[in-house]
Swiss-Prot record:
Pfam families linked to this entry: Cupin_1
Region (Disordered): 111-131, 195-216, 251-322
Disulfides per UniProt: C31-C64, C107-C328
Bias-annotated ranges (Low complexity): 195-207
Sites where a glycan is attached: N397, N439
Subunit-level organization: Hexamer; each subunit is composed of an acidic and a basic chain derived from a single precursor and linked by a disulfide bond. Component of globulins complexes which accumulate in seeds.
Signal peptide as annotated in the record: 1-19
Keyword Nucleotidyltransferase: no
InterPro entries according to UniProt: 11S_seedstore_CS, 11S_seedstore_pln, Cupin_1, RmlC-like_jellyroll, RmlC_Cupin_sf, Seed_Storage-Functional
Name of the protein in question: Conglutin alpha 1
Species in which this protein is naturally found: Lupinus angustifolius
Tissue expr: Expressed in developing cotyledons and in the embryonic axis of germinating seeds.
Key words of the record: Allergen, Disulfide bond, Glycoprotein, Seed storage protein, Signal, Storage protein
Keyword Glycoprotein among UniProt keywords: yes
Amino acid sequence: MANKLLALSLFLLFSGCFASTFRQQPQQNECQFQRLNALEPDNSVKSEAGTIETWNPNNDQLRCAGVALSRCTIQRNGLRRPFYTNAPQEIYIQQGRGIFGLIFPGCRETYEEPQEQEQGQGPRPQDRHQKVEHFREGDIIAVPTGVPFWMYNNEQTPVIAITLIDTTNLDNQLDQIPRRFYLSGNQEQEFLQYQQKEGGQGQQQEGGNEGGNVLSGFNDEFLEEAFSVDREIVRNIKGKNDDREGSIVEVKEGLKVISPPTLRPRQGREEEEEEEEEEEERRGDRRRHRPHHHEEEEEEEEWSHQVRRVRRPHHHREDRNGLEETLCTLKLRHNIGQSTSPDAYNPQAGRLKTLTSLDFPILRWLGLAAEHGSIYKNAMFVPYYNVNANSILYVLNGSAWFQVVDCSGNAVFNGELNEGQVLTIPQNYAVAIKSLDDNFSYVAFKTNDIPQIAALAGLTSSIRALPLDVVAHAFNLDRDQARQLKNNNPYKFLVPPPQSQLRAVA
């Protein structure tokens, strides 16, 4: 019987994994643009210790890409209350440091405080919880659908986090309006106004319970029995005694949780080695903290881990590194900021770093990836296109001139993109970027866990790969001109400024 149950569970799990490898397709003509626009947040919800800004998910560009965006600012000692969403999230830390946690149902609480004696009362109950991790500027944090997430700023610098929600991922069985299900508090839903505009009165009723969190609508008696607590605690659970504003609250005396040592600033390969050491330490923590009694529970835990293996064959391939990770031991963050080793680097033009599921396996489950780029003033990212993904680009610093061209050869965007603005670059649309500032940088969220780009100019371009005669006849050039077109640009992706504009080199 147990074997049959395990087989059925694995079948259901892998069926779900295969299903989530595909994204819902946009409706007909939803991705046909005569013009793209630089987008800015159009709604802001203030909290006691921060602010959450949102972009309208009903905007045509975001609907085409099937995503929603928000920007969260958390002040010193600010705690973002635990919540989960109806779609996977990819979070980029633009600024600041702190700690965060994800709560995976069924995983053990492997972090526990030392047992203490209370005077005259014997041992005090230990606090145990699931793992807590540090984050820093440049980190990508992956949050699967329906997994509760919280974060806390324990530094002086405000934390700024950019979140992409993949609303067309098939893990989302609702509509394309993102929903944040808070576990506590009494706060406004950040995307509620878009639900009301899109869905009318029916949607207003959906968000209209009096407490504002997922427990608020239950009867007091239900919660008393479920948690085995008194009526006063139930009132707090439902948010009735909580007059703190919003979903980010101030922890005046600082948050006391069991967490690993604070990350030390590192550079380049040292930082990557530190992350590898942290990953091994996380695995060791799980082994050390696993109870050695109750054999039946231990077997049940191991069975649970086996059932929850993450094998998302997004591209119908064998596991790429021969390893399988369980939900309970997954690596949840990966740094792609300035301090990491770039994938492409030109000392006079800039650097690029791409994060895919090959580096960060949980992205296979989410079906997402990310790219960080910094381009020096007057340097160019050659014309290219995203082969198999939409790209949602957010400007972190500075400004740059963007040109985006559709399949008919029309420039659907030709203008400046500034700090804090977003541009959606649809799949296969050609794009070129020229930096207007020395500190221009961006993060781009990609809707494929192994995104590919194809250059249209330069050393690795499609045109360079064509036979000379094909280039000559396709572009109506003589052979010498065709040879120049193929070979004159010796750079792969990032082209330095013209010689007259190059920065002086000591």
